[in-house]
Every structure is written in C-alpha cells, then in structure tokens.
Amino acid sequence: MLTFIGLGLFDEYDISLKGLEAVREADLVYAEFYTSCLMGTNPEKMEKLYGKKVHLLSREDVEQQPDWLDKAKDKNVAFLTGGDTMVSTTHVDLRLRAEKLGIETHLIHGASIASAVSGLTGLQNYRFGKSASIPYPYESRRGAIIISETPYDTIKQNSELGLHTMIFLDIDKDKGYMTANHALELLLEVEKRRGEGIMERAVAVGIARAGSEKPVVKADYAESLKDFDFGNPLHILVVPGKLHFLEAEALVKLAAGPGKIMEETE
C-alpha cells in the first residue's frame, strides 16, 4: 500500500495525528520537497518525531524512475509531501502510476497554502480564479533573457472576470527560492513590455512563512510592494481582482494595505 501524507505548511508539528500514526506504522517512509518544502524543520527533526528513517527523493526519483514504488506492492509505504498531498499534479500522476501497478493508495490530507492564503488575507476562497506559477527567467540559445508572460496573461484573464490570482513562486535547486519581490519585478517587466495596464494599477499581496508563528502578510500596489522586505522564504503572491468591501477592509486591517483600496470595492 502507498499512503500519501500531506505534512502541512511550516514544520514537523503540522502533520495531523492521523498522518503521524500512519508514518509510524509504515514499513518505509519516503519524502519529496522539490514541489514544496517545510522551512521550519529538517529531515533530522522529522525523523526524531516520527521515530522513522525518512528517505529523500529527487525530482527524477518521483517523476522519471520511481523504482522505489515497487516496494509498495508488498510493503506499507508512506510518501510525504509539503502542504496537502494532492495539490501537485506530480503527485496525482504518481498515484495513477501506482494504481496501474495494482498498488492500493490512500490519502491523508494536510493544511494547504490555498486555504491558508484565504485565512491570512481575508480574501474569499470562492473568488479565486486559475492559479499561476512564475518560473525564473532563462537564457535562450541566442543569449536573450526569456521571461514567461503566462502568469501575466492569467492575471489579466482573472481580472477581467473579477477574480483573484494565486501565484506560486519557483523553487530551483541552483537559484533557490524565488521571493515575492522578484516575482513582482518580473510581472512589472512584462507590464513595461506590453503596456496593458494590468500590473500598473494592481494591488498585490505577499505572504511569507505561512503556517509559522509569525507569518508576514503585506498588501500594497505592486510598484510599492516590490520593495517591501518579506524576510525568509517561502513566499507566495496574490493579485486580487475586484474586491468585496469586506475583503478590502481585511487587506487594510490584516495586511496593512493602503486605505485607498476601500474606495475601489464593488
């Protein structure tokens, strides 16, 4: 059997009691932290709490050559992930592969950044549209620096519908954790190129270290927010669409947003 266990948002103590019990009962415990990771802990602390050895998997181990998956045919295997265990399509794909191999799968959910963002910002969860991810720029074969415009397009589409956009930020083994500041700079660079006024007038909300004792939540106009010090990772970014008056009040009072947004509500 293969049990997918979501570990929550920040440290080893965010795991549910049901999840902890499943880890302790497992024959083998694997974890991947390239789609998301817990910044408030490390494998040693996790192993101490669980009383189990945690085997760390690379992207290749999970997506290309999951040889370890065969062990779940006759053993009780736990697979640990940050956040909720089925938010990433990588994990859905892994579950489907396991089922095709005749391996029984089971899910134990964990706290998700999607629900945490709504709670921390006061933005209503049913008013979110399609989410986006901002990757690091890369250099083309001709030496040009390529910035993805897909996140900008997603924000534009959601904005036209009055919906909020949650933006996940890149985690790269060489470049590290993308900050909300860098993400805003990239969006504003695309704005500069295209001149459509999407980010020029947009309010944005940055969240850092959700799930910790002292998360940072700050709202402001994008041009100003890019200079705010969010501190250590992980960061996530939200670009709200049309704000309900309660959402605007929440951003002002809970995220130190500019009072002017109270005048721009529906």
Swiss-Prot record:
Its EC number is 2.1.1.98. Pathway: Protein modification; peptidyl-diphthamide biosynthesis. Belongs to the diphthine synthase family. The lineage of its organism: Archaea, Methanobacteriati, Methanobacteriota, Stenosarchaea group, Methanomicrobia. This is Diphthine synthase. The gene is dphB. InterPro entries: 4pyrrol_Mease, 4pyrrol_Methylase_sf, 4pyrrole_Mease_sub1, 4pyrrole_Mease_sub2, Dphthn_synthase. Homodimer. Gene3D superfamilies: Cobalt-precorrin-4 Transmethylase, Domain 1, Methyltransferase, Cobalt-precorrin-4 Transmethylase, Domain 2. GO terms for biological process: methylation; protein histidyl modification to diphthamide. One of its GO terms (molecular function) is diphthine synthase activity. S-adenosyl-L-methionine-dependent methyltransferase that catalyzes the trimethylation of the amino group of the modified target histidine residue in translation elongation factor 2 (EF-2), to form an intermediate called diphthine. The three successive methylation reactions represent the second step of diphthamide biosynthesis.
